[in-house]
């Protein structure tokens, strides 16, 4: 984020702006019938700096840049005559190419003009432009002068805060060649900063004069589509699947999308696609066991918990690491069995904190508590209850197979394959009576029995403690051919 901008600062939010978009002609004579051959002669006194990258492919041509300077004056003259305030309205204008067509974006402060009347004023602005700029010749371009609305088709007038400009328009998420003019001096400070960061290649600033900025050439530019796809990849790599997690990690990228038209829709779409990408390409272990800081394993609460419960920490860590890596074969489930207060839920909760897509299943397997957990990276089966009616489905789920659970005649839910954590106060095998069923469970579960209640001063296990413990254990892996019960140290 720009260091000089606080998006909650009153300066960046108090003023409200409307946005006009004017489409320019790709061929002047064809799309503005009747225009005279000496149309541009009246612009001969307009001073426009020349830079080498102005003539790069995709940059707005000099005709359009020159035309924009005049159109801005025409619109502002109309606007300031309509407002009831003594000072000229604040404004920001940006010229660029969109899909090969030149365009002008103009944000104007709403001082003295109700937003409900913008439609009427836009119609009048079209007429003024045709009369005073196009010499009475109406452009033959669909929707050539429009204002931003809250909906794509219809809706009310969309208003913007000043922060929309630095977060959305000055960022390289729009077409890469942009010219801009403004009478808002504070935006000059923003331009100074992004110029130092080499986002723009040319920048002129004069006191009390329009500002002009010329973004860097296409080598460093990136389209909105590419930026959006890159954002999805970034979300997937970091396991970000909620808006809160996104804001905590990088509010700048969140704000860049939010300030665009229909930004909330783009944010939800990006998170939805990121979730699907994570489900299809990642494992739970991909989000765990990544530590780049020094630590003492003997001070780690997970290590201390397994020692307290008389387990070998290396063996326990090896089992958990292989289980999360889908390397346990049929053994797709770890169960933590013990009385309340033994630490099983605290340990499980810390594991799940590291994994972006997880589900919690309570009690017995039924349609009500399955629908929400179609495809997750880890499933916590809390207070697991096993009944004979669904045993084949339960066996497949605990064994790491994909199951399709019928909801009704026309609907179903798919679960797995994903690692399972089962917690209970009683041994899972005691829930079935058939020896065959007990054998099936033994083949699919690593069972940890926690028989000691942790002391009151025992440290709370955090998500980073899980990371440290598994990072330590992965390089100390040992053979763990265990039938069902994880052995304890005498």
Swiss-Prot record:
InterPro entries per record: NS1-Nuc, P-loop_NTPase, Parvovirus_NS1_helicase, PV_NS1-NUC
GO biological process: DNA replication; viral genome replication
Keyword line: DNA replication, DNA-binding, Host nucleus, Nucleotide-binding
Sequence ranges assigned to domain PV NS1-Nuc in this UniProt record: 1-210
GO (cellular component) term, any one: host cell nucleus
Subcellular localization, as worded in the UniProt entry: Host nucleus
Disulphide-bonded residues: none
Molecular function via GO: DNA binding; nucleotide binding
Protein name: Protein U94
Species annotation: Human herpesvirus 6A (strain Uganda-1102) (HHV-6 variant A)
Protein encoded by which gene: U94
């Amino acid at each position: 984020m720009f260091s000089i901008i606080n998006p909650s600062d009153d300066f960046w939010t108090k003023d409200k702006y409307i946005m006009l978009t004017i489409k320019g002609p790709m061929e002047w004579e064809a799309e503005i019938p009747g225009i005279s051959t000496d149309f541009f002669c009246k612009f001969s006194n307009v001073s426009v700096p020349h830079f080498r990258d102005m003539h790069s492919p995709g940059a707005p041509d000099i005709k359009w840049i020159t035309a924009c300077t005049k159109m801005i004056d025409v619109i502002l003259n109309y606007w300031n005559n309509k407002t009831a305030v003594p000072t000229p309205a604040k404004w920001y204008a940006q010229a660029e190419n969109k899909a090969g067509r030149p365009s002008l974006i103009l944000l104007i402060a709403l001082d003295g003009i109700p937003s409900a009347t913008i439609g009427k004023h836009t119609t009048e602005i079209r007429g003024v432009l045709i009369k005073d700029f196009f010499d009475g010749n109406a452009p033959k371009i669909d929707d050539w002068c429009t204002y931003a609305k809250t909906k794509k088709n219809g809706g009310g007038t969309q208003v913007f805060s000043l922060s929309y400009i630095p977060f959305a328009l000055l960022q390289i998420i729009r077409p890469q060649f942009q010219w801009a003019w403004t009478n808002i001096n504070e935006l000059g400070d923003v331009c100074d900063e992004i110029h130092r960061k080499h986002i723009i290649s040319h920048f002129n600033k004069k006191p009390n004069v329009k500002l002009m900025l010329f973004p860097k050439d296409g080598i460093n530019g990136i389209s909105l589509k590419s930026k959006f796809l890159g954002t999805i990849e970034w979300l997937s790599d970091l396991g970000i699947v909620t808006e809160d997690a996104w804001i905590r990690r990088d509010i700048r990228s969140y704000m860049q999308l939010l300030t665009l038209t229909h930004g909330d829709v783009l944010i939800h779409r990006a998170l939805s696609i990121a979730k699907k990408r994570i489900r299809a390409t990642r494992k739970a272990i991909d989000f765990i066991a990544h530590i780049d800081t020094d630590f003492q394993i003997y001070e780690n609460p997970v290590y201390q918990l397994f020692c307290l419960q008389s387990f070998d920490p290396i063996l326990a860590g090896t089992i958990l690491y292989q289980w999360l890596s889908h390397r346990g074969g049929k053994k797709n489930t770890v169960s933590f069995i013990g009385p309340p207060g033994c630490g099983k839920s605290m340990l499980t909760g810390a594991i799940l904190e590291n994994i972006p897509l997880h589900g919690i299943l309570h009690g017995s397997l039924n349609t009500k508590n399955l629908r929400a957990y179609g495809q997750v990276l880890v499933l916590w089966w809390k207070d697991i209850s096993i009944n004979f009616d669904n045993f084949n489905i339960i066996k497949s789920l605990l064994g790491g197979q994909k199951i399709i659970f019928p909801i009704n005649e026309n609907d179903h839910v798919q679960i797995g394959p994903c690692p399972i954590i089962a917690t209970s106060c009683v041994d899972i095998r005691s829930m079935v009576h058939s020896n065959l069923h007990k054998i099936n469970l033994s083949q699919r579960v690593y069972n940890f029995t926690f028989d000691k209640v942790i002391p009151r001063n025992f440290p709370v296990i955090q998500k980073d403690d899980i990371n440290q413990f598994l990072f330590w254990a992965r390089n100390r892996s040992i053979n763990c051919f265990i039938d069902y019960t994880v052995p304890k140290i005498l």
